[in-house]
Amino acid sequence: MFENIGWAELLVLIVAGLFILGPERLPQGAAWLGRTVRQVKEYATGARDQLRSELGPEFDELRKPLEDLRGIRNFDPKRAMTNHLFDGENPLDGVTRNGSTPSSPSASAPRPADQRPLAPGEKPPYDSDAT
């Protein structure tokens, strides 16, 4: 019921309750809120138990599709297909986004012929085919 309320929202509600009720009426307000939440929870539990007793085994049959839908909510098609096709093994482990396999930088980088620093006043080599 309250799974979408985070700590920030809860803090805002507490601060708003403190300002609205004031420090002298806040304990009575918190007690009333606790009693109300407990009563609503008891009503919901009673309704569920009454429905379960009236429907009998059909109640579990009605809950099964709802539990299946709850499982689909966190469905990831890519992960499901990978698990189905490769029995949980991911064949793409170690493959980069462009499809190449990563290797050590020394193996993938081309080796320049001469990598010495230029002397003062010396011009860098010029390749007419590269421009």
UniProtKB/Swiss-Prot annotation:
Biased composition (Low complexity): 102-112
Residue segments, region Disordered: 80-131
GO molecular function, one term: protein transmembrane transporter activity
Gene3D superfamilies: 1.20.5.3310
Organism superkingdom: Bacteria
One GO cellular component, as annotated: TAT protein transport complex
Subunit description: The Tat system comprises two distinct complexes: a TatABC complex, containing multiple copies of TatA, TatB and TatC subunits, and a separate TatA complex, containing only TatA subunits. Substrates initially bind to the TatABC complex, which probably triggers association of the separate TatA complex to form the active translocon.
HAMAP family, per the entry: TatB
Protein name per Swiss-Prot or TrEMBL: Sec-independent protein translocase protein TatB
Species of origin: Saccharopolyspora erythraea (strain ATCC 11635 / DSM 40517 / JCM 4748 / NBRC 13426 / NCIMB 8594 / NRRL 2338)
Source lineage: Bacteria, Bacillati, Actinomycetota, Actinomycetes, Pseudonocardiales
